[in-house]
Amino acid sequence: MRFAVLFLSISVPATAQTGTLTIYSILHAVGEERYQIEPSEGALKLSTTFEYTDRGNKRTTTADLKMTGDYTPLSLEIQGRPTDVHVQAGSATVKEDTAARTFATPEKYFAIFGPSPFAVQMMLIRYWNAHGRPAHLPILRARADATPLEIELVGHDSIAVRGAMVTLDRYTIANLMFGREILWMNSNGDLAAAMTFAGGLPMEAVRTEYQSAFPQLYRSGVSQELRNLQAIGKLAPPKRTGSFAIVGARMVDATGNPPVNDSVVIVRDGRIAAAGARASITIPNDMAIVDAKGQTLLPGLWEMHIHASGVEFGPALLASG
């Protein structure tokens, strides 16, 4: 599937651009972000302030991102976190907490440390579109093994704003944090909305003038996450589907009873139909057998108070046991 996107010229704007985003946590408005993009010494400068209240605690982060006219980062300074990036003559110096590194910049790159402030992500998408939409985009980090970002244009959404229809481009971003974020951009290259996570809990941002469409965008984002989950499932398909018996494992059933050393678990259409000692379970003659001798089996799920904020958390937690 191919998508067409229209963007304005990437020349340096003659006047300042401003915007305000309303910040949500678990669908409750908790703060806002205010940003300004203006010419600065022949280049661009983004200044943004991100403020929100979390359980009575007010948190403020400010960022200054300087870029060339094609959105290539020259420096990024974030107050509220001990992080900064400076690029000069093809060399980048990055400081994160107590770590620091100086290295040659790749051919294409961006400077960003996490989901917020959201205006930095807006400039990330502008850079990505202006530089040929690379499949893997390196980010300047103190860690040499930082995973490149994977950005995809995955669809479009149309929303009604003051009686007019506005078409937004929907993106996913992987490797900025665990899982994939979802972002929407308008035709001017402005951030319309974003869905991400903070502290294991959902966090959203929406352009203030688009607030009336937030419920629609949120539903679209959830649908996109389910499509992301389907794609993950294809990467690691189950070894067995339908009906089968898992035989011979040491079963721990979380009831407080001693483990069952020679167990049988009957699965029918993805659900556990029976589980217990081999002597107590009858295996149908025509049922496929999975030999689990020497392994430990935990049938079902244990609730251990996890924050499964994104669809990627489920497969990752299952894979880790």
Where does each model-flagged region fall?
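Metal-associated gating/positioning segment near the N- to mid-region
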Residues: M287, K293-G321
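Bacterial N-terminal signal peptides
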Residues: R2-P13
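N-terminal, post-signal-peptide region of Sec/Tat-exported proteins
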Residues: Y35-D70
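Extracellular/periplasmic ectodomains of large secreted or surface enzymes and adhesion receptors
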Residues: A205-G248, T282-I283
